[in-house]
Amino acid sequence: MILNDRKIRELIESKELLIDPLDAVQIQPSSVDLRLGNDFLIYPEDIEILDVRNPDLHNQLKKVVADDEGFIIQPKQFILATTREYIKLPDYLTAFVEGRSSLGRLGLFIENAGWVDAGFEGNITLEFYNANSRPLKIYPGMRICQLVFAKMEEPAENPYRGKYQGQRGTTASRIFLDKD
C-alpha cells in the first residue's frame, strides 16, 4: 500500500519515520520531495579502469562541495550526489526514489538502486548522468527527487543492516565489501 500525505505526516509525528531536515511543503499527496545536498563525488578522467575488487577505488574519487552558486554537470558526465535529508525507515516500511520529470526533460538522469529497504537509515546517494549535449547547472537545496513509501504486510524479518547503513553525505560504491 502506497502511503498518502496524511499517513506520512502521522508516521513522522509519531517518530516512526525520520526525515531530517523536513519542511511541511515537501510532503506531497503520495510522496516526499527530497532536496539536493551540497557534496558531490566525481570519477577523475585519469582512472583507466573501475575495478570492482579495488578497495581503494573510493579514495580516488574527487570530492566537490558546491555552494549557492551551484554545480555544473558536463555533457555525458556521471557523478554521485546525495540528498540533504537523512532518513530512517521502520522495519515495516520500504520506499523507492523517483527522479523529477522536470529535470529529466533537461537530460538529467537521476538513478539509484531505486529501492530503499525497510530498516535503512542514512542519506540517499544519487547517481546523476547528464545525457544532454549542454552543461547543466544544479543547486544545493533544490528539489531533486521524490521518495514514495509503501507499507509491507508484515515487518521485515531481516531489515536492512547492510554496508550503506548510516551513510552520511555522498557515499561511493562499497561493492568491494561484497562476499560474492
UniProtKB/Swiss-Prot annotation:
Residues that coordinate or bind dCTP: 100-105, 117, 125-127, 146, 160, 167
Catalysed reactions, as listed in the record: dCTP + 2 H2O = dUMP + NH4(+) + diphosphate
Site feature Important for bifunctional activity, where: 114-115
Keyword entries, A-Z: Hydrolase, Nucleotide metabolism, Nucleotide-binding
A GO BP entry: dUMP biosynthetic process
UniProt-annotated catalytic positions: 127 (proton donor/acceptor)
Single GO MF annotation: dCTP deaminase activity
Pathway: Pyrimidine metabolism; dUMP biosynthesis; dUMP from dCTP: step 1/1
InterPro entries: dCTP_deaminase, dUTPase-like_sf, dUTPase_trimeric
Enzyme Commission (EC) number: 3.5.4.30
Function summary: Bifunctional enzyme that catalyzes both the deamination of dCTP to dUTP and the hydrolysis of dUTP to dUMP without releasing the toxic dUTP intermediate.
Quaternary structure annotation from Swiss-Prot or TrEMBL: Homotrimer.
Family: Belongs to the dCTP deaminase family.
Protein name in the entry: dCTP deaminase, dUMP-forming
